[in-house]
Regions:
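Conserved, single-site charged/polar hotspot
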Residues: 1-250
Length: 250
């Protein structure tokens, strides 16, 4: 939980994150091809999924003991809480910031799950760095596109990108790139973009890519959970909003 949300965020948001992470871990266990060889990955070096005690101490400094005690108490209070769908733990995925709507799972991972559908998360528009622009030189973009097996014409960089087709939630489903169709998630990964909700502009020899939100967009918006908690919603209410049709079991 400490790796996923700032300790300064509301109790109910932190509890919602803890329940989602627990449920997602159980879902991964139940759907692993080879459970004995591992079914969930974390990357402490990149601060993903898990933080070492040393890193937590460096983050929290003199507030370490107080913060750890608070977070431990919050996690302990929901330790046995799990989101279920159809009598099995739900794949309660989570991410940082949406574009204002969450994304349906089939548009990102190819598999539709009835509780991973588009829901409103318009409070995310107030998130820090909701809009974020990165710049690529034409040479950098050419190298990336070539790495995707595309053939960009060096003499006509303005023609490399066509008009994007969007999902219902407004993320890029696909777009023409150098005469071929590339999915939004694939281009996001190749370019290291914060989100698959992006626009592309070419001007004066450079490409400007502006994203809305941060993360894959499926499931619990962490910023949205913070906003709903600040509005007085409980962890259970937050999870019911982002994972419709699920049941919280204790």
């Amino acid at each position: 939980v400490a790796a996923e949300m700032p300790i300064s965020w509301p109790d109910e948001a932190l509890k919602a994150q803890a329940i989602a992470a627990h449920s997602y871990a159980l879902y991964c266990r139940d759907h692993a091809a080879e459970p004995a060889s591992g079914w969930l990955s974390v990357d402490p070096v990149r601060r993903q999924g898990y933080l070492t005690d040393a890193v937590l101490r460096s983050y929290w400094g003199t507030a370490y003991e107080e913060n750890y005690a608070r977070l431990s108490a919050l996690v302990d209070s929901v330790l046995t809480d799990v989101l279920y769908y159809d009598s099995a733990p739900a794949g309660a995925s989570y991410f940082a910031i949406s574009n204002g709507m969450t994304e349906a799972s089939e548009n990102v991972w190819g598999t539709a799950l009835p509780y991973l559908v588009a829901v409103d998360s318009s409070t995310d528009l107030n998130a820090d760095n909701y809009l974020y622009t990165v710049q690529f030189t034409a040479e950098q973009m050419q190298q990336t596109l070539t790495g995707l097996g595309l053939l960009p014409d060096p003499a006509a960089p303005a023609s490399w990108f066509g008009e994007a087709a969007l999902t219902t939630s407004g993320y890029v489903a696909s777009l023409p790139v150098c005469g071929q169709s590339v999915t939004g998630p694939a281009l996001r990964k190749a370019l290291g973009l914060r989100s698959a909700c992006f626009t592309v502009q070419y001007q004066e020899g450079s490409f400007l890519l502006t994203t809305k939100g941060y993360g894959h967009g499926v499931g619990l918006s962490q910023w949205g959970a913070k906003a709903l908690a600040e509005q007085g919603q409980s962890a259970e209410e937050i999870l019911a909003h982002y994972f419709p049709g699920t049941e919280l079991r204790r």
